[in-house]
Structures are given as structure tokens and as C-alpha cells.
Amino acid sequence: MDERRTLAWHETLEMHELVAFQSNGLIKLKKMIREVKDPQLRQLYNVSIQGVEQNLRELLPFFPQAPHREDEEEERADNPFYSGDLLGFAKTSVRSYAIAITETATPQLRNVLVKQLNAAIQLHAQVYRYMYQHGYYPSYNLSELLKNDVRNANRAISMK
């Protein structure tokens, strides 16, 4: 395989998903650790925070290789974070329900899970539309999408 100077579109999008998910998760971990009193659990949070920070630091150098152009940076408020976290929750719910359905043999339970899967899909669509309409998820502008990932990852890493 030859050495490429740019990432492929599909791997760029996968990287986006990982960085967006981990950035939001890191912000939540750093906010929640303040409430954790148990020393052993607090240590687990610290290990998790350090691991996610390292993951982000290792992924960020690949962003310049993504197929996009550099744009100016802009400040972000909390609404993009909160809506992004909700979108991640909805997406994970869809995946979790889909997996659970494949493991379910009881028809009544399967029907309930399918109903709940459809509700999770609807929630995902609503949150996505909200984010897109407010400019928080520029899904048709890869350059802007990746710029947001880098900004959020750096914000999460620098957060105390």
C-alpha cells in the first residue's frame, strides 16, 4: 500500500465520530469527577480521563491530513455541547437497541424493543435537525465538521 498524504473520506468520517464522541465524554468525565467521593472510583475516573485525553492527542495530528480546507475558528457556547451529547446518546441508543433485538428470542420483548428502537431513531432525527438548523452539526461541510472536532477536542483536553 502506498503512503497517502490525505485520509480517505470514510476513515475521516470514522475519526470524526470517535473524536466527537470522546470529546463530549471527556467533558462529562471532567465535570462528574468533581462529584465523586469514593477514592477508588475517583481513581478510575482519573484513569479514564487520562486515557481519553491521550486518545484525542493521538488522533488530532491526523486532522490536517483530512480532505478539507482550513477555515476561521469561532467561539462555541454550551448548546452545541449539550445537543452533541444528546445526539451521541441517541445514536448509542439506536445501536444498543439494534444489538439487543438481534439477541432477543421472546416475541413480546422483541416488539417492545422495536418500538423503543423506533423512538430512539426519532429522537436522533430530532436532535440532528436541531443541531443542523443551529449550525452545530454542519454534516454537509466536512471541513467545518472536522474543524469543530479539533476545537472540541482541544477544549476538552485543556479543561480543568
Curated annotation (Swiss-Prot):
Record propeptide residues: 1-4
Major location (coarse): other
Subcellular location: Spore coat
PTM remark: Generates the two 5 and 8 kDa components of the spore coat, after proteolytic processing.
Record flagged with keyword Transmembrane helix: no
GO BP terms, alphabetized: sporulation resulting in formation of a cellular spore
Sorted UniProt keywords: Sporulation
Entry keyword annotation includes Isomerase: no
InterPro entries membership: Ferritin-like, Spore_coat_CotF, Spore_coat_CotF-like
PANTHER family in UniProt: SPORE COAT PROTEIN F-LIKE PROTEIN YHCQ
Misc: Present in an increased level in yabG mutant spores.
Family: Belongs to the CotF family.
Protein name as it appears in the record: Spore coat protein F
Record organism: Bacillus subtilis (strain 168)
Gene that specifies this protein: cotF
